[in-house]
Amino acid sequence: MTEFKRIPPEQAQALREQGAVLVDVRDAQTFQSNHIPDSVHLDNHSIADFIAKADLDKPLVVVCYHGNSSQSAAAYLVGQGFSDVYSVDGGFELWRATYPDETVQG
């Protein structure tokens, strides 16, 4: 894959169940207050370390607030060598509306 794909929350959940890595690019405080279980918070401070330790061929699902910022982040991650990248349309807000029991705090 040379470009990322935009996917709905249902497809993101299916990928998550198959072992995909979920990264959340919202701000740290918002991430702490509510996020998808087992997702990784990714920001300018953590991205280099994340990339260095990541399996570039493992599916990577990017989520933000509403599905806009995640597209830029997904494109960047493709440029860094990730081969299977997805951006969640509707972001965390649509995820939370679709899967209200699939969020955690802290």
Swiss-Prot record:
Domain of life: Bacteria
Reaction catalyzed: thiosulfate + hydrogen cyanide = thiocyanate + sulfite + 2 H(+); thiosulfate + [thioredoxin]-dithiol = [thioredoxin]-disulfide + hydrogen sulfide + sulfite + 2 H(+)
PANTHER family (UniProt xref): FAD-DEPENDENT OXIDOREDUCTASE, THIOSULFATE SULFURTRANSFERASE GLPE
Organism of origin: Pseudomonas savastanoi pv. phaseolicola (strain 1448A / Race 6) (Pseudomonas syringae pv. phaseolicola (strain 1448A / Race 6))
Keywords assigned by UniProt, alphabetized: Cytoplasm, Transferase
Alphabetical list of Gene3D superfamilies matching this protein: Rhodanese-like domain
EC number: 2.8.1.1
Gene Ontology CC: cytoplasm
Gene Ontology biological process terms, A to Z: glycerol metabolic process
Keyword Transferase in annotation: yes
NCBIfam families: PRK00162.1 (NF001195)
Protein name: Thiosulfate sulfurtransferase GlpE
Active-site annotation: C64
Protein function: Transferase that catalyzes the transfer of sulfur from thiosulfate to thiophilic acceptors such as cyanide or dithiols. May function in a CysM-independent thiosulfate assimilation pathway by catalyzing the conversion of thiosulfate to sulfite, which can then be used for L-cysteine biosynthesis.
Listed Pfam families: Rhodanese
GO molecular function, one term: thiosulfate-cyanide sulfurtransferase activity
Record's subcellular location: Cytoplasm
Domain Rhodanese: 16-104
UniProt record similarity statement: Belongs to the GlpE family.
Disulfide feature: none
